[in-house]
């Protein structure tokens, strides 16, 4: 919600562009029955997309054009935990997606959602405006530090706590 306040206060000016990323090795690493995430109707867009897309709409307004490409890097996955550990299951859907989203305000944001990345620790979004840049924490976590930079090398760390925000009733960004 701190990101929403920064935008409302014009802290980074008019937002021109941005990017977001959620990269993860897949549900087979942490769930004993992950197959539904890899069947038709599953995948990273269905699982994580709503968090990132609703946050972007909350911060930038409606999207007017979206282009996407999905890729499936493997036809099988292996259970890594649970009673089926070591067994394989079929993958039916794309497991990595790249996005190009154009908003009504003419901002363009690129994104990447993936169940194919083994080691990544920067799940977040960045927005770049005419007066500065902002790093928004992973929307799936509903809070965390927001970094604001207005000139080369400068950063502001703020803690986004939904319970103290004037936007508390919409803390998940879904209204």
Each model region followed by its residue ranges:
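Glycine-rich phosphate/pyrophosphate-binding beta-alpha loops
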Residues: 107-120
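Predominantly a Rossmann-like dinucleotide-binding segment in NAD(P)-dependent oxidoreductases
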Residues: 1-90
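Conserved hydrophobic/aromatic beta-strand scaffold that supports enzyme active sites
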Residues: 17, 98-100, 110, 126
